[in-house]
Amino acid sequence: MKDGWTITHDPLRIRLARGKNLFVDLGAERLLAAEKGTEKIAVEIKSFTRPSDMKDLEEAVGQFVVYNHLLRRYYPEYKLFLAVSENTCKTVFEEEAGQTLIEDGIIQLFSFDPNQEVIVRWLP
């Protein structure tokens, strides 16, 4: 992942009680020029390959919500982002269902170009 980020965990493991684990695809950080310290993010990458992009969306959001709540509890320094290709961003997250999730703050998202491995845009 480019754009000034360094991968720190591949995957980022969330250790739960009783030996259970969840794995977020990536943990990353970057140095902040304007302030001391680092910014840390966790990234869950989704492909949206099913015939129904709404089914993919339901699954991705459910997983995002679970991971987000557990990260807040166990790794509060990380902010979780869903990462999708720019094409998926246009076909799913610029439509009503995806826009509602972003506008209501349910998910944080960025799109990337899978060929060049660069972040295209961040959506709040």
Regions inferred by a protein language model and the residue ranges of each:
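Metal-dependent nuclease catalytic cores in nucleic-acid-processing enzymes
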Residues: M1, Q63-R73
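Short aromatic/hydrophobic-glycine micro-motifs
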Residues: G4-T6, I106-I107
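Active-site metal-binding core of divalent-cation-utilizing nuclease and nuclease-like domains
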Residues: T6-I41, D56
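Short beta-strand-loop-alpha-helix junction that forms the active-site gateway
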Residues: I45-L57
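Switch/connector loops and helix/strand junctions flanking conserved nucleotide-binding motifs
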Residues: S52-D53, K90-F93, V118-R121
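Nucleic-acid nuclease catalytic cores
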Residues: L57, H69-G105, F112-P114
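Charged phosphate-binding loop/patch that engages nucleotide di/tri-phosphates or the phosphate backbone
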Residues: Q108-P124
